[in-house]
Amino acid sequence: FDENVSELDRQALIKEAFDFKVDKNGANSIPRTFMVKDHYSDVPWSKRISGKSFWDKKWIDIEFDPVMEIDLNPEWKTLDEYSSALRKKSRAKLRRIDKDSSALVLRELSYEEVVENADKLIALYSMVYGRAGFKLGMLYKEDLVFLKKYWKDDFPVIGYYFDNELVGFQCGIVTDYSVEAFFVGFNLNENKTHSIYQRMLIEFIKQGIARGVMKISLGRTALDIKSSLGAGPKRLVCHMKVNNRPIIHSLMRAVASSSSPKIPKLKRAWDDELTSPLSISSRS
């Protein structure tokens, strides 16, 4: 949503979008389960009633791990300027990652190249996806191809090559406001040698600086690594509603009561006076 759209108007628009029927086996039926994914939560832990939605009493709030985000200072025009605001250990880490990944060749793939390499890209993605502790949906090659076709240059797919072999890729949505990391994939053995994943995080930061965005969203996993590079945690909730299924609704509320992960103590990447506002607000 545009930042000028109020919270009440956002809720009304979302609820209106759910007022539809689908055709199932030739008969119209109304979906019984709805989900609104990734809504920022500023409700303090002490005031949060697990499971009960702060958005609407008929909904359930389920909270997972926080998303790691970076607020960019508009004065930062290069990665060096970004790095200069970090603490000494984080600057050293950036240099180490750059050295470890120096043998890699990075190249943005065209739509035609995404289509041509779709099977390989998904195979690399599956190596990472298979190790994930929490899984909500999976990327298929048709999705990847469609996203590139629809978003064009705003969906850069970066290939990582070692000895002319594709060993990794990253992709995300890049707008004038934010960079949102979507999916990554890489050869696990090459990652150990060349720090592919950590290099990808740096490339997302570079994309944000080059585009002049306000925010970079790096996703939920690997909180410690991302915090050491300057990201801070932001709490997100998923709103769920189950119609005409009181037993399932009760079970979902029970699940929600145990889905309130505390944000762990993370590494401090910024000097005290330059600490990201995201890191401060996430402590509420």
Regions found by a protein language model. Name each.
Residues 119, 123, 198-206, 224:
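Feature representing long, continuous alpha-helical segments
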Residues 6-21, 191-206, 218:
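Conserved acetyl-CoA-binding loop-helix of GNAT-fold acetyltransferases
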Residues 1-3:
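Residues forming anionic-ligand binding surfaces in small-molecule and nucleic-acid pockets
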Residues 18, 22-194, 274-284:
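A conserved beta-strand-loop-helix scaffold within acyl/acetyltransferase catalytic domains
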Residues 6-30, 234-239, 248-251, 256:
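An exposure/low-complexity boundary signal
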Residues 54-81, 85, 162, 211-284:
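Active-site/acyl-donor-binding loops of N-acyltransferases
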Residues 126-133, 149-152, 165, 171-172, ...:
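Hydrophobic alpha-helix feature that most strongly marks membrane-spanning transmembrane helices
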